[in-house]
From Swiss-Prot:
Amino-acid positions noted as binding Mg(2+) in the UniProt annotation, renumbered to this chain: E231
Pathway: Porphyrin-containing compound metabolism; protoporphyrin-IX biosynthesis; coproporphyrinogen-III from 5-aminolevulinate: step 1/4
GO molecular function, one term: zinc ion binding
Known function: Catalyzes an early step in the biosynthesis of tetrapyrroles. Binds two molecules of 5-aminolevulinate per subunit, each at a distinct site, and catalyzes their condensation to form porphobilinogen.
Lineage, broadest ranks: Bacteria, Pseudomonadati, Campylobacterota, Epsilonproteobacteria, Campylobacterales
Cofactor: Zn(2+)
Primary gene name: hemB
Catalytic activity field: 2 5-aminolevulinate = porphobilinogen + 2 H2O + H(+)
Superkingdom of source: Bacteria
UniProt name for this protein: Delta-aminolevulinic acid dehydratase
Parts of the chain that traverse the membrane: none
Co-factor note (free text): Binds 1 zinc ion per monomer.
Species this protein is from: Helicobacter pylori (strain J99 / ATCC 700824) (Campylobacter pylori J99)
Disulphides: none
Keywords: Heme biosynthesis, Lyase, Magnesium, Metal-binding, Porphyrin biosynthesis, Zinc
Active site: K193 (schiff-base intermediate with substrate), K246 (schiff-base intermediate with substrate)
């Protein structure tokens, strides 16, 4: 006697009834890039079709569209006019993400604003903190990250997302937030962030390629699974409220490993290179794009992700509404 597993696959409705993993619009976070400008700018990025650098007014229109589709959270990255060795723009109370957050909250008070907390977009060298002897100084960078975090919390950001991969960044930020009275501001840590070539197109849109070297001395070696788990569990101990794995597609084993070892919510970042590959395949009619897109997102959830940060968020929301 053998089990006839095909019985439950015989119709679309039956397959839907027994489906174990389901996508929901609430799963998605849309990354947005806000550029400092006095005029209305919306620049499409050639390596990421459908992704834009936007000044505040176009950004607000984009938020309106996202809210209309049911998306409840955005992740903001800032692109300043001025960059210097210490990323001083990020320590200004009127820096671009702080200003954008205040404007978003005036119009869409229920939209969750998550702010990426790093310095690579603000430094002229493209590294994620203060340089010392051609290397990023861990502890000096923690101090300015705390200052940036406090400015963003004051501007109304709902969640802070430190992405710098400095040791101790979550504990340092949590202490600074609590001391300033921001006890209820959650930290979404980029807890397991790999030094990945999948980030290539992001550096086009964020104008943040390193001017020398790479980020392998602080971002993780993609060959290491045990260290990947250790990084996330360490951030949990330090007080992270949400953990993250970045990139996504080639790292689902890491997502599953972390999911099996924590009860915290787990985010997954579907990064620029992954987005660009699907878009290129769509352009050349190599795949059924919509089908592959939904399959990919479903597999992210199946691996254990509770939320998905994706440049496809708006497309997926449209597909889910249609289906």
């Amino acid at each position: 006697m053998f089990k006839r597993l095909r019985r439950l696959r015989s119709s679309e409705n039956l397959r839907a009834m027994v489906r174990e993993t389901r996508l929901n619009i609430n799963d998605f976070i849309a990354p947005l890039f806000v550029i400092e400008s006095d005029s209305g700018i919306k620049n499409e990025i050639s390596s990421m079709p459908g992704v834009y650098q936007m000044s505040i007014e176009p950004l607000l229109k984009e938020c309106e569209e996202l809210v209309g589709l049911g998306i409840k959270a955005v992740l903001l990255f800032g692109i300043p006019k001025h960059k210097d060795a210490t990323g001083s723009h990020a320590l200004n109370k009127d820096h671009i993400v702080a200003k954008a957050t205040r404007e978003i909250k005036k119009r869409f008070k229920d939209l969750i604003v998550i702010a990426d907390l790093c310095f690579c977009e603000y430094t002229d060298h493209g590294h994620c903190g203060i340089l010392e002897n051609a290397s990023v100084s861990n502890d000096k960078t923690l101090k300015i990250l705390n200052l940036q975090g406090l400015i963003l919390a004051e501007s109304g950001v709902d969640i802070l997302a430190p992405s710098n991969m400095m040791d101790g960044n979550v504990l340092s930020l949590r202490k600074a937030l609590d001391k300033a009275g921001y006890f209820h501001t959650p930290i979404m840590s980029y807890s397991t962030k790999f030094a990945s070539s999948y980030y290539g197109p992001f550096r086009d849109v964020a104008n943040s390629p390193p001017s020398f070297g790479d980020r392998k001395s602080y971002q993780m070696d993609y060959a290491n699974q045990k260290e990947a788990l250790l990084e996330s569990l360490e951030d949990e101990k330090q007080g992270a409220d949400i953990l993250m794995v970045k990139p996504a597609l080639a790292y689902l084993d890491i997502v599953k490993e972390i999911r099996d070892h924590t009860l915290l919510p787990l985010a997954l970042y579907n990064v620029s290179g992954e987005y660009a590959m699907l878009k290129l395949a769509q352009k050349h009619n190599l795949i059924n794009y919509e089908s592959v897109l939904l399959e990919t997102m479903t597999c992210f959830k199946r691996a254990g992700a509770d939320m998905i940060i994706s440049y496809h968020a708006k497309e997926v929301a449209n597909l889910l509404q249609r289906n």
